[in-house]
Amino acid sequence: MKKFILASNNAHKVKEIKEILKDFNLNILSLNEAGIDIDVEEDGKTFEENSFKKANEIRKYLLSKGESDFIVMADDSGLEVDYLNGAPGIYSARYAGEHGNDSKNNEKLLEELKNVKDDERKANFICVIVAVTDKGEKIVAEGKSYGLILEALSGNEGFGYDPLFFVPEYKKTFAEMTSDEKNAISHRGRALEKLKDNLKGILK
């Protein structure tokens, strides 16, 4: 069974990806599960640059260890708010200065949008996935979800900006959805669906 290494140890993200790719005959592993301890600096100017850098560094590491027959997948995702000219964008995870502090990031976003009218609170989540094979083949897949930023947190599921991201068609935030509902329409879910189509060609 081909190894499919996820360039992440984020438990929420790993669970989401494993659920969506469960129909493939792949041994899907997080970095911890694969015994890989590499910290790749995300200093790219775009989501794709960050994703490719992560995936390719891990690919090179695995090749140096004599590994073969594997795929490494990395994704970079973020929130783009129209009123803020696309911010926080590639800085979404560290918007408030400290990497991965969801509550502080949400607080900062609410502060930035204080007194901003509903029709100016449009936003989208974007996810860009890059998968590289041991032979250096590269697949890029992008997905987006569109919604509005609420004035207060709502819901207990998900992570990141999910409690503020309201999807009008569902009348729910990402944090109020079941994992199946969210996976069907989330930016990562949509990017992974595109990735699945591309993987079929590689896994024949």
Curated annotation (Swiss-Prot):
Magnesium among keywords: yes
PANTHER family registered for this protein in UniProt: INOSINE TRIPHOSPHATE PYROPHOSPHATASE, INOSINE TRIPHOSPHATE PYROPHOSPHATASE/HAM1 PROTEIN
Cofactor binding note of this UniProt entry: Binds 1 Mg(2+) ion per subunit.
Active site location: D76
UniProt keywords, alphabetically: Hydrolase, Magnesium, Metal-binding, Nucleotide metabolism, Nucleotide-binding
Described purpose of this protein according to its UniProt entry: Pyrophosphatase that catalyzes the hydrolysis of nucleoside triphosphates to their monophosphate derivatives, with a high preference for the non-canonical purine nucleotides XTP (xanthosine triphosphate), dITP (deoxyinosine triphosphate) and ITP. Seems to function as a house-cleaning enzyme that removes non-canonical purine nucleotides from the nucleotide pool, thus preventing their incorporation into DNA/RNA and avoiding chromosomal lesions.
CC per GO annotation: cytosol
Catalytic activity: XTP + H2O = XMP + diphosphate + H(+); dITP + H2O = dIMP + diphosphate + H(+); ITP + H2O = IMP + diphosphate + H(+)
GO MF annotations, alphabetized: dITP diphosphatase activity; ITP diphosphatase activity; metal ion binding; nucleotide binding; ribonucleoside triphosphate phosphatase activity; XTP diphosphatase activity
Family indicated by similarity: Belongs to the HAM1 NTPase family.
One Pfam family it belongs to: Ham1p_like
Residues reported in the UniProt entry to bind substrate: S8, N9, N10, A11, H12, K13, S77, F159, G160, Y161, D162, K182, H187, R188
Residues holding Mg(2+): E41, D76
EC number(s) stated in the UniProt entry for this protein: 3.6.1.66
Lineage: Bacteria, Bacillati, Bacillota, Clostridia, Eubacteriales
Keyword Hydrolase: yes
Subunit structure of this chain's protein: Homodimer.
Name of the protein in its database record: dITP/XTP pyrophosphatase
Necessary cofactors: Mg(2+)
InterPro entries xref list: dITP/XTP_pyrophosphatase, ITPase-like_fam, RdgB/HAM1
GO biological process, one term: purine nucleoside triphosphate catabolic process
